[in-house]
């Protein structure tokens, strides 16, 4: 249906000589684009406002040709959420859905940060924070934490000491680290699935998105998690 609608729209624009062959999402596009330069790319992932991952599956039954599997991994639900995760989920537009995405993505990390901070500071209402705010806090440094102090003053009306700001930065980092490790765990699961009973093959993971590209410490924590989970096999993955 989508292909037909796209084809009709192209014709209306006078572009009748283009025939759409396939409709793909951004996750699959990341894998395919990376595979042009890195033929051993097996996993494509979006780590941004939302989260999803796909992978190239070769071991399909009945002689079916290799196929890219879109996992919709943001909807994974066999997790161990904490009470802040549950509070965020219950207040969301679709409670019970996209549980992993609500624990890892840029859309929700700032909200989680605000929920925890409200309890930590004993605030009467949850302050509004975004992942951009978290990035600013993570970029801020000792000894003064000036940007963090200014941001917290704006959002909460409270003037914090440098020690308080250091604790707030630690909270932001903890939320980011958990996000990166959960996302990386999904990659490790795919890698182990593809390896089966054999050794982990040399392969490339293509990751795109605002959290991975722009949030401080995101890339470093994904890489660290790969080594923590895969051990020596992580040397086969880049």
Language model segments and positions:
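Acidic, glycine-rich loop-and-beta core segments that form the ion-binding/anion-interacting portion
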Residues: 56, 60-103
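Short His-Asn-centered micro-motif
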Residues: 24-27, 47, 208-209
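Glycine-rich phosphate-binding loop and adjoining helix at the ATP-binding site
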Residues: 1-35, 41-43, 63-80, 219-221
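Structural beta-strand/beta-sheet cores of well-ordered domains, especially the beta-sheet scaffolds
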Residues: 41-45, 49-51, 67, 203
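Short, glycine-/Ser/Thr-/acidic-enriched flexible segments
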Residues: 50-51, 60, 76, 114, ...
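Short beta-strand scaffold segments in enzyme catalytic cores
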Residues: 29-33, 44-46, 51-57
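ATP-binding/phosphotransfer module of carbohydrate and carboxylate kinases, centering on a glycine-rich
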Residues: 11, 35-38, 43, 85-238
């Amino acid at each position: 249906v989508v292909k037909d609608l796209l084809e009709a729209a192209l014709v209306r624009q006078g572009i009748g000589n283009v025939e759409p062959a396939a409709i793909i999402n951004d996750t699959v596009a990341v894998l395919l684009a990376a595979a042009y330069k890195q033929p051993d790319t097996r996993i494509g992932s979006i780590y941004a406002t939302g989260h999803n991952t796909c992978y190239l599956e070769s071991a399909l039954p009945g002689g079916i040709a290799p196929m890219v599997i879109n996992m919709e991994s943001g909807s994974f639900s066999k997790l161990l959420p904490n009470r802040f995760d549950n509070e965020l989920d219950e207040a969301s537009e679709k409670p019970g859905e996209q549980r992993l995405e609500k624990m890892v993505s840029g859309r929700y990390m700032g909200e989680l940060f605000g929920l925890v901070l409200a309890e930590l500071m004993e605030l009467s209402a949850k302050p509004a924070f975004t992942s951009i705010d978290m990035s600013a806090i993570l970029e801020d440094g000792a000894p003064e934490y000036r940007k963090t102090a200014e941001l917290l003053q704006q959002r909460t009306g409270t003037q914090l000491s440098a020690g308080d700001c250091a604790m707030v930065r630690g909270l932001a980092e903890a939320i980011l680290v958990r996000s990166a490790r959960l996302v990386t765990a999904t990659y490790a699961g795919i890698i182990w699935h593809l390896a089966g009973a054999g050794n982990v093959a040399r392969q490339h993971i293509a990751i795109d998105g605002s959290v991975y590209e722009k949030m401080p410490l995101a890339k470093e924590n994904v890489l660290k998690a790969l080594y923590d989970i895969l051990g020596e096999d992580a040397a086969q993955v880049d």
